[in-house]
Amino acid sequence: MLEKKTIAELDPVLWDAMQNEVRRQEEHIELIASENYVTPAVMQAQGSQLTNKYAEGYPGKRYYGGCEYVDIVEQLAIDRAKELFGAEYANVQPHSGSQANAAVYGALLSAGDTILGMDLAHGGHLTHGAKVSFSGKIYNSVLYGITADGVIDYADVRTKALESKPKMIVAGFSAYSQVIDWAKMREIADEVDAYLFVDMAHVAGLIAAGLYPNPLPHAHVVTTTTHKTLAGPRGGLILSACGDEDIYKKLNSSVFPANQGGPLMHVIAAKAVCFKEALEPSFKVYQAQVLKNAKAMVEVFKQRGFDVVSNGTENHLFLVSFIKQGLTGKQADAALGAANITVNKNSVPNDPQKPFVTSGIRVGSPSITRRGFSETDAATLAGWMCDVLESIGKDNHEQVIAETKTKVLDICKRLPVYGIGR
């Protein structure tokens, strides 16, 4: 018999944890750059009966019967993704960004091939060749970084490309606040006859809104997550406009059957919702405010004497270095967390601390903007953060945290996420 109890009735312990998370999201300010708040429509799709359906294969070419309606769902997601980013090809099945990246490598590389990617310590991602990742174990990874000014060292990229002759150059980041010159990266890739693969996960929403350069005209393949600035469900997406049907076929085969089995149709439906939302004019307004809020926060940190890596931001995130202050990212993370402000500790260039400690934090504006924060609100918040950070190690530290927490709760009440659970 089909059990029809609610979670609260069936599993009170789990329900209590879920409700506490709802309250945490309502009563804490979220500044983790890779997080965002999805709409009720996205959640409705993810909680639908589509979760019941197995659909190995692709629309019109399934290994299971009864897929006539999920075919419509997936094709909607594919078509909307193409329209949103100007792509010729889209695969909406990857379960995550890392899975999407693994599929790209599997499609175009062989084990032992050389890839040239951005150093994790300089703002890259684990899957761009870090030695602790599959990308640095299966493939021979060479890493490039940023200059003392905090911008990508294209001369270094070119030199290392000429020396290592990679089969693929990986562009993209998890903690880089400036604009990447996609055309320059393609020029370097062409010089060594390499594929250019772009991971635009962090800036996909800005790109969709036309506020950050689109890599599709330059890259052979592009991947992204569907959350972060895109504000959709957790998942991955592969795109291309290279015009090479052979590459498209290899990418499809690398996702299924090589890396994954059945797609998550409820998540694909949520992706379709997310892409439709991103095609609305209001999405561009939102993304423009994301940029304004990030820049407003940067100015406050600089005015208060903190070092901002790259001296600013041209997207939704920025890094604050505490090397000068002698603080660690772990200390800052904990202190801000006690005041209901959630950030993540992050390594910064020339960081003397270990990765689990770090000397900096990463700050992102997508979630606060989703709540309705203006530039004034964002600047005020940055000031509160500076108050907390400056009080670390001082006698008034606990008092500052308590006062800041009260202010945070007040603004969260004024600008709720969903307005439930408090």
UniProtKB/Swiss-Prot annotation:
Database matches in Gene3D superfamilies: Aspartate Aminotransferase, domain 1, Type I PLP-dependent aspartate aminotransferase-like (Major domain)
Gene Ontology BP, a term: tetrahydrofolate interconversion
UniProt source species: Actinobacillus succinogenes (strain ATCC 55618 / DSM 22257 / CCUG 43843 / 130Z)
Cellular component per GO, a single term: cytosol
NCBIfam families: PRK00011.1
Stored Pfam families: SHMT
Pathway as given in its UniProt record: One-carbon metabolism; tetrahydrofolate interconversion; Amino-acid biosynthesis; glycine biosynthesis; glycine from L-serine: step 1/1
Source superkingdom: Bacteria
Cell compartments where the protein resides: Cytoplasm
Keyword set, alphabetical order: Amino-acid biosynthesis, Cytoplasm, One-carbon metabolism, Pyridoxal phosphate, Transferase
EC number of this enzyme: 2.1.2.1
Catalytic activity: (6R)-5,10-methylene-5,6,7,8-tetrahydrofolate + glycine + H2O = (6S)-5,6,7,8-tetrahydrofolate + L-serine
InterPro entries: PyrdxlP-dep_Trfase, PyrdxlP-dep_Trfase_major, PyrdxlP-dep_Trfase_small, Ser_HO-MeTrfase, Ser_HO-MeTrfase-like, Ser_HO-MeTrfase_PLP_BS, SHMT-like_dom
Family of the protein in this entry: Belongs to the SHMT family.
Presence of the UniProt keyword Amino-acid biosynthesis in the record: yes
GO molecular function terms noted in the UniProt entry: glycine hydroxymethyltransferase activity; pyridoxal phosphate binding
Coiled-coil intervals, chain numbering: none
Job description of the protein: Catalyzes the reversible interconversion of serine and glycine with tetrahydrofolate (THF) serving as the one-carbon carrier. This reaction serves as the major source of one-carbon groups required for the biosynthesis of purines, thymidylate, methionine, and other important biomolecules. Also exhibits THF-independent aldolase activity toward beta-hydroxyamino acids, producing glycine and aldehydes, via a retro-aldol mechanism.
Annotated site (Plays an important role in substrate specificity): H227
Name this protein carries in UniProt: Serine hydroxymethyltransferase
